[in-house]
Structures are given as structure tokens and as C-alpha cells.
């Protein structure tokens, strides 16, 4: 099967950031056919994918797009299992090895009601992310005094359920961010992908992993 026979169905509106690479540009450069599924803000639904399930289709986009529009395409989308929940893997290893070892867990809808308690525990700034590896919203740090506006914005953009469990921890400064692929306990490849909040891809970090 040649790469021209592989088709992609994508929805990238939620991922667009100025200066960041776009997957649709990579598909165009490689002459790969793709369909961009638009998100309707009124119905909160994605447009249907016009490909057949007997075609080779790769899916890429937000979790809701994958869950609602994957009709059984092969290979489809690559995602996460429950063992990528932070509460799962952080309970298997010494918590002091984790950046957010001081974390606690709260349902998304309860965070706003725990404002003063969180301030007493963590100080003026906190970090919030979904427990799930699927990340229905991107983790963020926020000043406790601004938490109402930030949670309201997150609800409107990402629509997390009120009962979705979230990791809440003291906000910490991050310079470098990395991703590595590990197989059978061995780091196979990886890269730095961000430095001080800006896109900065480096691949000379494998030996340091």
C-alpha cells in the first residue's frame, strides 16, 4: 500500500497555535489526501467523515471527534487506556519521582467550591489537569483569585463534565518539556518539544533520558 492510498480524517481547529507546525501542511507536502472535519459551535458536533470503512483511514483530532466519528476505520486513531490516568501510574511508583507529587484529586465541578481550602494548601497559584490521559482539556496553572473566570472559560471551550476527576497541585515553573517513546523499559526515541512556553524541538536529548 502506497502512502497515497492512505487517507486522513482530521479536526484541528482546537489545536491551532501561532508558529506551531500544522499536520495539514505535512499531509499536503506528502501528497496525502485528507478531510478536515469542521466543528459546529451551535450543535457542538463535528461534520461526518466522507470515507468508507474499507478504506485505510487515520484519524487525528480532539477526543470527542474520535469517539463520535470513528465508524470503525482502520487503523483509526491511537489513544490512551485507563493505565495512563495520573491516579493509576502515580500510585504505582514513589510519588516523589513525580513533578506533581503534592497533588490531590477533585471533580471538576467541585474545584470552584474549594477555592479557599486550595489556597491554604497550595498558595496563590495552582495547577489543574484532567486525571485521564485523554485530557478533555489542556492542563493549566491559574491564580486562585482568578479561578472562576478560568474554570468558566475551560467549561465553554472544552465542556468537561462536572464529575470528571482532576489533578490539582501547587503551580511550578517549567522550562523544558519532553516526550519519549519507551518500549520494554527502554527509551527508543524522543525529543524536547517546548522551552519556556515556546515551540523548540530538539532531538539531541535521547542519551540524557
Residue ranges of predicted features:
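Active-site nucleotide/adenylate-binding loops and adjacent lid/helix of ATP-dependent enzymes
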Residues: 2-209
Amino acid at each position: 500500500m502506497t502512502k497515497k492510498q492512505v487517507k486522513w480524517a482530521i479536526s484541528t481547529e482546537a489545536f491551532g497555535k501561532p508558529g506551531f507546525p500544522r499536520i495539514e501542511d505535512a499531509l499536503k507536502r506528502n501528497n496525502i489526501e485528507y478531510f478536515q472535519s469542521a466543528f459546529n459551535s451551535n450543535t457542538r458536533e463535528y461534520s461526518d467523515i466522507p470515507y468508507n470503512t474499507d478504506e485505510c483511514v487515520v484519524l487525528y483530532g480532539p477526543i470527542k471527534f474520535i469517539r463520535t466519528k470513528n465508524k470503525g476505520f482502520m487503523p483509526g486513531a491511537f489513544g490512551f487506556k485507563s493505565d495512563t490516568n495520573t491516579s493509576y501510574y502515580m500510585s504505582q511508583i514513589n510519588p516523589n519521582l513525580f513533578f506533581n507529587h503534592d497533588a490531590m484529586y477533585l471533580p471538576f465541578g467541585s474545584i470552584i467550591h474549594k477555592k479557599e481550602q486550595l489556597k491554604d494548601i497550595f498558595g496563590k497559584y495552582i495547577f489543574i489537569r484532567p486525571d485521564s490521559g485523554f485530557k478533555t482539556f489542556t492542563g493549566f496553572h491559574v491564580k486562585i483569585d482568578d479561578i472562576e473566570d478560568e474554570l468558566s472559560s475551560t467549561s465553554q471551550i472544552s465542556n468537561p463534565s462536572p464529575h470528571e476527576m482532576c489533578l490539582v497541585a501547587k503551580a511550578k515553573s517549567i522550562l523544558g518539556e519532553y516526550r519519549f517513546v519507551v518500549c520494554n523499559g527502554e527509551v527508543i526515541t524522543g525529543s524536547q518539544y517546548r522551552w519556556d512556553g515556546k515551540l523548540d524541538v530538539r532531538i539531541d536529548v535521547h542519551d540524557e533520558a
